[in-house]
Every structure is written in C-alpha cells, then in structure tokens.
C-alpha cells in the first residue's frame, strides 16, 4: 500500500508529491500523457515568482527530477476508476492489478480544446498559443488574433489589447457567449477588430506563423496576416470517471467547498481539475502543497 497516490503529473500533482515525499511518505504518481501538463505548452514562463524566465518544458523537467530524486514512483497508465476505499484501477492490460493508498489526490488538470485545423500543431510555440497570460507579452507591439466566443476569449482580447499593436477577435457566430462588460470595453478599444461569422480554417507560415486562412459562413475565404494566434475555445476537465467519489459541477470541474476536500474521505483534489477562479502555475502549485499537507495531517 502507498501512503499517497496522485493522479496527474502536472504542477499540482508534482508539487503534492514533493511535499509528501519530504514528509517521508511513499508516493505513486499516475500520468497518462506527458509529465508537466498544460505548462508544457508555455514557450516561456515569466510570471512565476522568483524565476525571471524559463520554458514550460524546462520547468516541468526540473520539477520531475526533483520529485524523482526524492523517490517518487511513476506509472504511465490511464486511471479509469477510483473506489471509495481508495483503490485505483488503470488501463493496465493485466486487469487484476490495482493500487491502494491511504490517500488519493486527483490532479488531472484540463485539456485545451483544439481547432483541429492544418498548421495548428506545426506552429504550436511558433505563434500558436492556448494561454494569453502565459505568452501574450512575447507579442508586444505585434498583430495577433484570438479565436473564441466565451469569457476566456473576451478576457484574452482585453488583456492583449494592452500589449499588442492590433488584436483581431474571430468568432464563428455574430453574438458572443461572454459577458457584456467585456464586449462593451472591447468595442471602445481602438486596436481591437471583430471578425464575426467566421472560422480559422488554416494556419500558414514558414519558420513561424505568418497568416491565417479565414472562412466565413458564406464560404468566402480570406487571408489575415498576424504574428500570433491565441486559441480560446474552451477547456475540458477529465473528471467523469471519478463521479462515484466526487461531486462535479455543470462544466465538469470537481466541487470542493474548501478547495481541497471532496465528498469522499481521504480523496482530495488539486489544481485545474477543481472549480476555481484562476488557473495558473502559481495556483496549481499552491493547491498541490495544500492537498498533500492536508492529506498527511488527516491520515
């Protein structure tokens, strides 16, 4: 039996592991994809206190090495179920293998929804970004586009309008789902231009992003020259498989009244997987440290 099993090896999960390992606990971490989570997408991290600049990849590598050197055990399997007794089931081909712990921390994070268009993967980190607060400062006095129609897209447009020379807000409809206060502000902002009833259908360039192919609802195609594209079409948490041990809100996030406990004793949540107002690296590591500390205290 493990002391703590952590599901997810992003900043929240790895920080939880760090605190647990320093308390001499036996820790197992499950990761279905790549260690680091969403922060891997960040070209540079410049808003983490005490670190002037670091790539998301380098930050993730450093954090991984830190917990690995302290004795963390990693398994690259997909968790498919957790029961009330903290028995963890995975997609391991040998179905009779399960894992048990005194405490479980769910830190599965979220996935950014993709446009799934030509060039999106090719120019990731070369003009394509899913995080305006992470990468916006690299586009100072440049021209950028944002695609999306919810609050994230509108907030990103407000934020980027103070940094970029020009901001194009592209939306597939003529009305937005986001709040009116953001729209009113954007309509008064001189360097913001709306491109409505349109989709980004292709991303083009050479060594970096140079232009977007835009197709409107009349199937008219045009080219928009920009330096960057911020994709803000939503995020998807991955919590449905845990709904027997946690409560989930209408958007799929884990409900926690105090930000750490779930409805099941000794099963905790940390990071972007839970309902919260701000999803940043700093809030993820904060969640992870709190979850581990509380889990240890309540063992």
Regions of interest found by a model, annotated:
Residues 74-138, 149:
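Glycine/small-residue-rich loop that forms an oxyanion/phosphate-binding "nest" at active or ligand-binding sites
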Residues 2-70, 152-179, 249, 294:
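Beta1-alpha1 glycine-rich phosphate/pyrophosphate-binding loop at the start
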Residues 67-89, 95-101, 162-257, 299:
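A Rossmann-like FAD-binding core segment of flavoenzymes
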Residues 8-13, 109, 148-150, 271:
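Conserved phosphate-binding and hydrolysis motifs of nucleotide-dependent enzymes
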Residues 1-3, 76-77, 140-142, 197, ...:
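Phosphate-coordination loops involved in phosphoryl transfer and adenosine-cofactor binding
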Residues 116, 122-138, 233-283, 287-290, ...:
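FAD-site-proximal beta/loop scaffold in flavoenzymes
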């Amino acid at each position: 039996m493990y002391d703590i099993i952590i599901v997810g090896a992003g900043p929240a999960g790895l920080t939880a592991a760090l605190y647990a390992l320093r308390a001499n606990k036996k820790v197992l971490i499950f990761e279905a994809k790549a260690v680091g989570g969403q922060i891997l997408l960040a070209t540079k991290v410049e808003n983490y206190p005490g670190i002037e600049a670091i790539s998301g990849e380098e930050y993730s590598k450093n954090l991984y090495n830190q917990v690995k050197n302290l004795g963390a055990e990693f398994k690259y399997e997909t968790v498919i179920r957790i029961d009330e007794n903290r028995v963890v089931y995975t997609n391991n081909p040998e179905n009779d293998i399960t894992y048990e712990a005194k405490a479980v921390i769910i830190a599965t994070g979220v996935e950014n929804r993709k446009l799934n268009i030509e060039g999106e993967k090719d120019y990731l980190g070369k003009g394509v970004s899913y995080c305006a607060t992470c990468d916006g400062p690299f586009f100072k006095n440049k021209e950028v586009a944002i695609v999306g129609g919810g609050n994230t897209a509108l907030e990103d447009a407000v934020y980027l309008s103070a940094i970029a020379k020009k901001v194009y807000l592209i939306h597939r409809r003529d009305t937005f789902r986001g709040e009116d206060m953001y729209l009113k502000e954007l309509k008064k902002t001189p360097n913001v231009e709306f491109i409505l009833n349109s989709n980004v259908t292709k991303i083009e360039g050479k060594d970096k992003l140079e232009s977007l192919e835009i197709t409107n609802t009349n199937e008219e195609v045009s080219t928009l020259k920009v330096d960057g594209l911020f994709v803000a079409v939503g995020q998807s948490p991955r919590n449905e498989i845990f709904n027997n041990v946690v409560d989930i809100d209408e958007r799929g996030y884990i409900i926690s009244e105090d930000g750490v406990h779930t409805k099941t004793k000794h099963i905790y949540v940390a990071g972007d997987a839970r309902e919260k107002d701000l999803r940043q690296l700093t809030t993820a590591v904060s969640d992870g440290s709190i979850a581990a500390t509380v889990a240890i205290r309540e063992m």
